[in-house]
């Protein structure tokens, strides 16, 4: 059945997870969409089919536990918002324990069929070689990590040479509450006070010589992940994996990212550390700290085991583990406004992995938000942002401004791709965590589990309220 709409179409460039979700959200709001996808005309080094929302790597959407896992929470919020990606994933799930894994072909076929069958969506198989022309007054770029070189060059020309990255160099991120401050201490090197700093901007983890040598041995022996053939990613100055630096000489690390100079152990000031691992605040909330200079190609299991050898990180919980990949993403915190619009080009939004989110559902969720925002703008409705207390809102807030931008490490950019995790959510109100009756000791893992359950419960309630409010605003417009 044909549906006639009086609205001009919104253009979406890229038919991956984010672009497909954005197109679906726009069409679901009654606005026509033209979805441009180059596969079918021009392939990529990683994709195998012409299907929309093809899963290039894993077939897992990770945990589906919405009671105490941040990924499960964003799954639930996307379902509430009518996500096509989640509906297709649910229909084509395969057994995977507590995770949501899918039959990749069935999933992609379902998304492709739904997009093609929607009367308000037109799919055009063509390569877009530049930024959208002026007559595309509203558009979304969702071209992902394998953005075509010509379009990437156009984005770079519009936003500036340093605004677009072609590789990510991800260092692990640790939850602040899991760091042992009886061993670690706050201090900037030489007590330097930088812009917005206090002279105590880093958390420092000391090592003696024996600990350092054991750590270097573990790094050299650790299992690593090789580059995929299509990545062709070279190592470059300023972003060597930590294990590669260790292989270049036993003293390399303690004269590089683990140098102890300018630091005094607050717990034992008369003893000079042989080496020091520094962690820097990563988000404005102060809940996440990244391991400075620790980008790595170690396998995830090896990372957790080896990095917990660091004094003070024995019980570390990781919000994100490290990696080094081919990727194309913009410096979103400086380029995008809170509605994902490019500040220099009103009407042009970015969505998905190109914004600096990491993961299938994260990419789709940013597409979901970009699509809803663009549809509201087309219809003349007020753009309603998801609350920061929701998974959608916390991820959006981090991408568009929650990350703390630093420039003290030449050759590196501080903004790196981020997955959804509880460290992005605002803290609970004081007094929210109450010890259960009859429990004598309530701390550590038990307290963390309750905290996450409360954050998840708050997120889902606030998301439901936001979606209800958004529907009301649309009805009034």
From Swiss-Prot:
Coiled coil: none annotated. InterPro entries: FAD/NAD-bd_sf, MnmG-rel, MnmG-rel_CS, MnmG_N, TrmFO. Its cofactor is FAD. Its main location: cytoplasm. Its EC number is 2.1.1.74. It is an enzyme of class 2 (transferase). FAD binds at residues 14-19. It catalyses: uridine(54) in tRNA + (6R)-5,10-methylene-5,6,7,8-tetrahydrofolate + NADH + H(+) = 5-methyluridine(54) in tRNA + (6S)-5,6,7,8-tetrahydrofolate + NAD(+); uridine(54) in tRNA + (6R)-5,10-methylene-5,6,7,8-tetrahydrofolate + NADPH + H(+) = 5-methyluridine(54) in tRNA + (6S)-5,6,7,8-tetrahydrofolate + NADP(+). It comes from the Bacteria. The keyword Cell cycle does not apply. It holds the Pfam family GIDA. Gene3D superfamilies: FAD/NAD(P)-binding domain. It is found in: Cytoplasm. PROSITE patterns: GIDA_2. GO terms for cellular component: cytosol. GO terms for molecular function: flavin adenine dinucleotide binding; tRNA (uracil(54)-C5)-methyltransferase activity, 5,10-methylenetetrahydrofolate-dependent. Keywords: Cytoplasm, FAD, Flavoprotein, Methyltransferase, NAD, NADP, Transferase, tRNA processing. GO terms for biological process: tRNA methylation; tRNA wobble uridine modification. The keyword Flavoprotein applies. Signal peptide: none annotated. Belongs to the MnmG family. TrmFO subfamily. Catalyzes the folate-dependent formation of 5-methyl-uridine at position 54 (M-5-U54) in all tRNAs. HAMAP family: TrmFO. This is Methylenetetrahydrofolate--tRNA-(uracil-5-)-methyltransferase TrmFO. The gene is trmFO.
